[in-house]
Regions:
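A detector for short, charged/polar N-terminal pre-domain segments
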Residues: 1-11
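Phosphate-coordinating loops and pocket residues in cytosolic domains that bind phosphorylated ligands
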Residues: 72-73
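Key DNA-contact positions within bacterial/archaeal DNA-binding proteins
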Residues: 28, 39, 68
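Short basic helix-loop element that most often maps to the first helix and adjoining turn
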Residues: 14-33
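Short amphipathic helical patch at the helix-1/turn junction of helix-turn-helix
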Residues: 10, 21-22, 50
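DNA major-groove recognition helix of helix-turn-helix/homeodomain DNA-binding modules
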Residues: 54-69
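Recognition helix of helix-turn-helix/homeodomain-like DNA-binding domains
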Residues: 34-51
Length: 74
């Protein structure tokens, strides 16, 4: 199925997921650190839920990447 989100947004989500996996962080662990259920992370990564800017910054920090570096790539 084709995503309803732009290529740029998909790149952002891909970078977040890759950083999470590279850091050996599970969806469960990331969700808990964010105060959300694992399903929240799964929905974000699968394109079922869109992040707002505050959630994006929090996720970047939790997976150890600089939000500005991701934005500069878009």
């Amino acid at each position: 199925m084709t995503s309803v989100y732009s290529i740029e947004y998909q790149m952002v989500i891909k970078a977040l997921r890759e950083a999470r996996v590279a850091g050996h962080i599970t969806q469960e662990e990331l969700g808990k650190a964010l105060g959300r259920p694992q399903s929240f992370i799964a929905k974000v990564e699968n394109g079922e839920r869109r992040l707002d800017i505050v959630e994006f910054v929090h996720l970047c920090r939790l997976v150890g990447i600089d939000p500005v570096s991701i934005i500069n790539k878009v």
